[in-house]
Amino acid sequence: MGILFEPYQVESCCLCGSGESLTGEHKIKASALRKIFGKDAMFIGNFDGESIPRLAQGPKSRAFHFSARMCSLCNGTRTQAADHEFDRFHALVFSFLSEGRDPSSVFSLPQYTSGSEDYLNVFRYFAKLLCCHVAESCGPRPLEACEFAIGQTKRNIIFLHIDVDPTYEAYRHKLGEHRFAAHGGLIVPFDSKTQNPASFRSSISLGPVRYIFWVRFEAIAGIELRACHYEFWRKCEAAYQEALKNPLSDEQRHRLGI
């Protein structure tokens, strides 16, 4: 039994740990993809000028699903309110951005007063995505984030930044307005002093809007990852060492939201 994390298990729900009635979860909601792309063809890739994008079969393509599993309860009843609230939240954010307003000012609306149920449900949606990204990387289940995602606690540990996706902007300057969606995978920043993970971080982009979301760790969390989940820690540490040897450019960091 872990203190802050539970070991990764392939055939277990990445939110509650159950092994029953396992289903899949979209990296980007199928309804959001349908709204953005309609019936137009979709291509999957890094769009970095190096790799070649490939054709996606449609919004329900397996390419848009996490390999990590989620039980039917967590994928339904326990997270449904957060899913629906994110839809409403994103519609408002997109509207604010379209009007030239700061998208983060959506939190000035009365329904998103800090600590309100609507406010918490927005952050629960991002907590769910972050837990899925950790499981996708065979990482241990972050218990506090998981409990928050499924509504077992009201303590919000998720940080959020909203901006315009730089990849979308780059293509807009070349091609004009276009259809675009993306996710940022999992980024695990390291603390240079402790040499342990300091955060889990990811992002999702829907059209021009990018949401960057993360959790921060106290030192004890990094220690537990290293001591009790060494294989995952070692994979993260190898990526950290590679980043030290080959630092990202300012443009790459901006593109990743770092």
Please provide the spans of the model-predicted regions.
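Intrinsically disordered, low-complexity boundary segments flanking structured domains
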Residues: 14-16, 109-113, 189-191, 198-200
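Generic structural signal of hydrophobic/aromatic residues within well-ordered alpha-helices
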Residues: 40-43, 74, 82, 86-93, ...
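Short alpha-helix boundary/capping motifs
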Residues: 41, 98-100, 154
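C-terminal, charged low-complexity interaction regions
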Residues: 135-258
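An N-terminal structural lobe/cap that precedes and organizes the functional/catalytic core
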Residues: 1-81
